[in-house]
């Protein structure tokens, strides 16, 4: 299966299905705000401040645990369904500069490491595609490259074969095709 990571949907699979992220950090922002406020209102060095800091740490730990649990469940589901999983090698640091908190909340790198670990315990193969491969801009039907495709265009029509393509599904199909080609050549 080919998988394309995204901001709107966590994963886009090559069959057109999408997997959304629960966005644990975003869901816990009010709780975090309250915990941070409690720390800032306490006097430095006091026992109440130490207690508030421990409480704040627990909130962050709970977010991390929820995200990690969801990643393991998703990785086990994907490994159970597919024998070969093709993903792209993402530039996480570059994405963090552009989208900040959203990328940190999605934690793509953590999911990829969990997916690789779960796959190593089974017969599933994880293939990483080069991050500079034009997965979104290539038509999966005829292979024409759409150089003028911008990030805002979510659906586009191929100039050569006139196929209407969803950007993310098309990228997932191209990732699967490139991953299988990379696997055959190795």
Predicted region positions:
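Positively charged, helix-rich recognition surfaces that bind polyanionic ligands
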Residues: 1-186
């Amino acid at each position: 299966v080919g998988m394309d990571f995204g901001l709107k949907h966590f994963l886009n699979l090559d069959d057109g299905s999408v997997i959304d992220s629960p966005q644990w950090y975003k869901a816990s922002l009010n709780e975090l705000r309250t915990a941070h406020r409690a720390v800032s209102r306490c006097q430095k060095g006091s026992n109440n401040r130490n207690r508030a800091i421990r409480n704040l740490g627990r909130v962050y730990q709970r977010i991390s645990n929820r995200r990690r649990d969801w990643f393991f469940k998703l990785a086990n589901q994907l490994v159970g369904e597919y024998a070969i999983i093709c993903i792209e090698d993402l530039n996480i640091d570059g994405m963090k500069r552009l989208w900040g908190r959203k990328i940190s909340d999605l934690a793509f790198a953590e999911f990829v490491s969990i997916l690789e670990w779960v796959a190593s315990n089974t017969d599933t193969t994880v293939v990483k595609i080069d991050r500079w491969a034009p997965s979104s801009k290539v038509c999966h039907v005829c292979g024409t490259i759409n150089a003028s495709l911008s990030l805002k265009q979510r659906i586009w029509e191929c100039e050569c074969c006139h196929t209407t393509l969803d950007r993310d599904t098309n990228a997932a199909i191209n990732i699967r095709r490139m991953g299988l080609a990379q696997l055959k050549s190795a």
